[in-house]
Amino acid sequence: MAPPAAPGRDRVGREDEDGWETRGDRKARKPLVEKKRRARINESLQELRLLLAGAEVQAKLENAEVLELTVRRVQGVLRGRAREREQLQAEASERFAAGYIQCMHEVHTFVSTCQAIDATVAAELLNHLLESMPLREGSSFQDLLGDALAGPPRAPGRSGWPAGGAPGSPIPSPPGPGDDLCSDLEEAPEAELSQAPAEGPDLVPAALGSLTTAQIARSVWRPW
């Protein structure tokens, strides 16, 4: 009678057999997996041929040529999208600049008609608004506002507007002793406050092109 085999040896033998079976299954499945992979590649290439059929793709092209044409087409689409984004950003920047300039004009009109505001304070306020003008250095947006920023800022009397940018609206005479000084915006004549875009077209940069003051008033960006 043969002695019984050790339990450890039986376990090692079964593991070796399982390992050989696993490796054998992998070798048997490898050709099938490779065949499926090639079929997927060929199917995708055929779909690319159909998608590009209306363009320069001919009836018979090598797979490498199909891939090259696909890469060119994708690159063209990406460049087009980038140009569209840049154009939208430029248009938004122009609208923001036009709105900012119009708001500065309205502030200038108010501080010019309000006798209670000191001339120095008004000049500092307007100069601060000019220095805070939204500019993007190195882009066409800076050229867009170049005409509006021409000349160093100064504080000419009551207006406090830089040289070359004064709207030209006359300063009203001081109110009588019984009048309140700038008690409320509603007490100021609406014509004086609403005529700012019409009196100061030179404040709008010439680089805005064909944009008129009325168009700017309708399309400007406002923070409220």
Curated annotation (Swiss-Prot):
Amino acid composition bias (Basic and acidic residues), ranges on this chain: 8-25
Domain bHLH residues, every copy: 25-77
Short motif (WRPW motif): ranges: 221-224
Compositionally biased tracts (Acidic residues): 181-190
GO CC field: chromatin; nucleus; transcription regulator complex
Classification via InterPro entries: bHLH_dom, HES_HEY, HLH_DNA-bd_sf, Orange_dom
GO BP term, pick one: regulation of neurogenesis
Residue ranges of the region described as Disordered: 1-31, 147-205
Gene Ontology MF term list: DNA-binding transcription factor activity, RNA polymerase II-specific; DNA-binding transcription repressor activity, RNA polymerase II-specific; protein dimerization activity; RNA polymerase II cis-regulatory region sequence-specific DNA binding; RNA polymerase II-specific DNA-binding transcription factor binding; sequence-specific double-stranded DNA binding; transcription regulator inhibitor activity
Record has Nucleotide-binding as a keyword: no
Compositionally biased tracts (Low complexity): 147-161
Location in the cell: Nucleus
Pfam families reported for this sequence: Hairy_orange, HLH
SMART domains (alphabetical): HLH
Quaternary structure (record): Transcription repression requires formation of a complex with a corepressor protein of the Groucho/TLE family. Interacts with HES1.
Function (record text): Does not bind DNA itself but suppresses both HES1-mediated N box-dependent transcriptional repression and binding of HES1 to E box sequences. Also suppresses HES1-mediated inhibition of the heterodimer formed by ASCL1/MASH1 and TCF3/E47, allowing ASCL1 and TCF3 to up-regulate transcription in its presence. Promotes cell differentiation.
Domain comment, as recorded: The C-terminal WRPW motif is a transcriptional repression domain necessary for the interaction with Groucho/TLE family members, transcriptional corepressors recruited to specific target DNA by Hairy-related proteins.
Name the record gives this protein: Transcription cofactor HES-6
